[in-house]
UniProtKB/Swiss-Prot annotation:
Renumbered residue ranges of the record's region Disordered: 1-36, 65-86
Protein name: UPF0291 protein LBA1279
Sequence ranges of Basic and acidic residues compositional bias: 1-27, 65-75
GO cellular component terms listed in the entry, alphabetical order: cytoplasm
Highest rank taxon of the organism: Bacteria
Family indicated by similarity: Belongs to the UPF0291 family.
Subcellular location: Cytoplasm
UniProt KW keywords: Cytoplasm
HAMAP family: UPF0291
Chain intervals with Basic residues compositional bias: 76-86
Listed Gene3D superfamilies: Helix hairpin bin (1.10.287.540)
Length: 86
């Protein structure tokens, strides 16, 4: 994910994950902090997967001759979102 495109909430989650990582490395985490770390990690992965899926679904693939070779699954997703008219 592009750091410039990261929302304030995503940045907050990432910063807190990093804080907890460094604390874990230096002094260890309390059980509550370990649980928080796990939940933040789940949230981070869900956000990452959603952004990645959106990027892939919006992608148009061309071969070296300029012919579109986008997968049918991606084309269907694009049609469903109104991004494609064919």
């Amino acid at each position: 994910m592009n750091k410039d495109a990261m929302s304030k909430e995503e940045k907050k989650v990432t910063d807190r994950i990093n804080e907890l990582y460094h604390k874990k490395e230096n002094e260890g985490l309390t059980p509550e902090e370990e649980e928080e770390r796990k939940e933040l990690h789940k949230k981070f992965l869900a956000n990452f997967r959603a952004a990645f899926k959106q990027d892939v679904e919006n992608m148009v693939i061309l071969d070296k001759n300029g012919k579109e070779v986008t997968s049918e699954k991606a084309k269907q997703a694009q049609r469903k979102k109104g991004l494609r008219k064919d």
